Structure formats: C-alpha cells, structure tokens
C-alpha cells in the first residue's frame, strides 16, 4: 500500500511523509535552541525592524514569540487576536522551530509565519479538526489534537479574513493570516446590541 501512495505523491511530499525522514522521536522538544525572528514592515519600500526571540525552554519560547508578535501587530494597527497568533506560533513545534520567521505586514493586519521544517504535505486537511502530526513529546506544549489551524480558520472565516498555507522556498511551510482591514466584523447574528 505504501508503494501505491508514494506513486501518487510528489518528491517533496514523499520526503516529508516518509517514516525514515521523521526524526521527531530523537528531537529534544523541552528546549528551543534556535533564534526566531520577527520582521515588522512599515511598508515594503524599506527594510523591516527585526526582533529576535532567543533560545529558551519551549513553553517560554512559544509564549515570548506569540506575545511579541501580538504586541507588535497591535501597535502597528492590527486586530488579529492573541489566540489566533498563539495557535499559529505553536505550529512551529512541528518544524522543530527551524528558522522560524514571522513577518508583520499591512499595518499589522497580515502576519506570515515561515519555517524551514519538513513542511505541510496535506494543506487542506491541516485546516480540518482532528488531523494532526503531533507526537507525544510535543503534547507537553501544544494540545496536539489537530485543533489549532481549524480554530484559526474558523475565526478568520467568521471575520472575513483569510488563511493560506504554502510551501516555503526549498523546504518548510508559510502560513499567512490576514484580517479584514483594520476592523474585522462579526456576522450580524453574533453581534450584541448595545442599549
């Protein structure tokens, strides 16, 4: 059966999905040893301001990254909630935090999360509840039940924002989330009348 599946997959997908290329079991998930970078763009005509998130225990690293991205995007005028940013930030664990880079664009309304990990082979299924590649050592830091990106997608769908998942250059993934302008709107049926 594995041969039939392999025949239908591209070379990159074969590399990403092949059990012999999955070295997560030997990876130390307790501490992030790499630096993450946050690039805040005022516009695309000038270089971004770059903030580095230094190596730290995994829980602290994820919290620091998500908090810094949230604060910088809000200060730039964005409205993407912390929970949405946190869910995507946690996904870097699947890439073993390899070259984690977050770009804040469009006055904080677009945030792009890029890595050079193994990538996401099934981009559509990654946005559906219950599909997960989390293994036991990751579950000390994330729920690991396949709910992260579906939560993000649901929020962005309700507020007329967008999420896209693409292959990065060479290897890895790029997840881009965008709010609807600077003031996303809830559907009328979810609004509360203020009297």
Question: How should these model regions be labeled?
Answer:
Residues 53-89:
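Conserved short strand/loop->alpha-helix "switch" segment adjacent to the catalytic nucleotide/phosphoryl-transfer site
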Residues 50:
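Donor/substrate-binding cores of folate-linked one-carbon enzymes
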Residues 1-46, 84-85, 89-195:
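Conserved beta-strand-loop-beta-strand hairpin that lines the nucleotide-binding pocket
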């Amino acid at each position: 059966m594995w041969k039939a599946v392999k025949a239908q997959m591209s070379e990159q997908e074969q590399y990403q999905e092949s059990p012999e290329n999955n070295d997560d079991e030997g990876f130390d998930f307790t501490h992030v040893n790499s630096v993450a970078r946050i690039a805040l763009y005022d516009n695309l005509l000038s270089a971004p301001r770059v903030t580095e998130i230094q190596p730290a225990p995994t829980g602290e690293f994820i919290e620091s990254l998500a908090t810094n991205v949230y604060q910088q995007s809000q200060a730039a005028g964005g409205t993407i909630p912390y929970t949405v940013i946190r869910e995507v930030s946690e996904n870097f664990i699947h890439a073993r935090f390899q070259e984690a880079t977050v770009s804040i664009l469009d006055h904080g309304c677009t945030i792009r999360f890029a890595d050079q990990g193994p990538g996401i082979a099934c981009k559509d299924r990654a946005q559906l509840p219950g599909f997960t590649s989390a293994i036991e050592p990751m579950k000390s830091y994330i729920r690991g039940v396949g709910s992260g990106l579906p939560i993000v997608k649901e929020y962005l769908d309700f507020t007329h924002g967008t999420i896209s998942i693409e292959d990065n250059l060479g290897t890895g993934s790029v997840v881009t989330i965008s709010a609807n302008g600077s003031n996303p709107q809830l559907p009328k049926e979810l609004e509360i009348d203020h009297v």
